[in-house]
Regions:
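Acidic catalytic patch
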Residues: 101-116
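A structural signal for long alpha-helical coiled-coils and helix-turn connectors
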Residues: 26-29, 100-103, 147
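Helix-adjacent hinge/juxtasegments
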Residues: 61-103
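Short, contiguous alpha-helical
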Residues: 11-25, 33-74, 114-167
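A general secondary-structure boundary signal
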Residues: 6, 17, 21, 89-93
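A short, structure-level motif marking secondary-structure boundaries and short turns
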Residues: 6-7, 30, 79-81, 127-130
């Protein structure tokens, strides 16, 4: 019988990051700030917000499909904050379900990141899922900077913020 030590740990970690990610995303007035960029080389706020909402779905693709091709990866067309939140919640459910249904043997299998069919790199799924959770945290942090620059209050994430003293 295959163990679920890694899958359980990754699922618990993902579940820890989701509430604060949700609190950030639900504060974004996407319709108003979609095209905001703090610098000419920065991502637009709409793209960054969608990226944060989509990252959990990557976990499901890693487990179930064993590859992601960023050239052909389908991105949702999101125009409203309501659509964004529905998309995020759906992606979280898919990630959680995939982790619940996987076992540690599954996570030892190889994941491939591709660009237009060309393999960019491969590694065990457990490594890339862990990196993907880090990626979510990184871009959520980036999003909080965009929020601050637009006068949007920053929620408590790992502790109180200047705007939210709850913990």
């Amino acid at each position: 019988m295959a163990t679920k030590i890694f899958t359980t740990g990754l699922l618990e970690e993902l579940k820890m990051e989701i509430p604060s990610t949700r609190k950030c995303l639900e504060r974004i007035p996407l319709e108003k700030l979609f095209h905001f960029k703090p610098h000419e080389t920065s991502m637009e706020m709409g793209y960054l917000t969608l990226l944060v909402a989509e990252i959990p779905l990557w976990i499901a693709h890693m487990i179930e499909d064993s590859e992601i091709d960023f050239v052909t990866y389908p991105h949702e067309k999101i125009e409203t904050s309501e659509q964004l939140m529905a998309h995020f919640e759906d992606n979280v459910k898919k990630a959680e379900t995939s982790l619940l249904n996987a076992n540690d043997d599954t996570l030892e299998e190889i994941f491939s990141l591709k660009a237009n069919g060309e393999v960019m790199y491969t590694s065990p799924k457990k490594i890339d899922i862990r990196t993907t959770i880090n990626h979510l945290v990184h871009h959520r942090g980036q999003l909080t900077v965009y929020m601050r620059m637009n006068g949007i209050s920053i929620p408590s994430i790992y502790g109180p913020s200047a705007d939210d003293k709850s913990f």
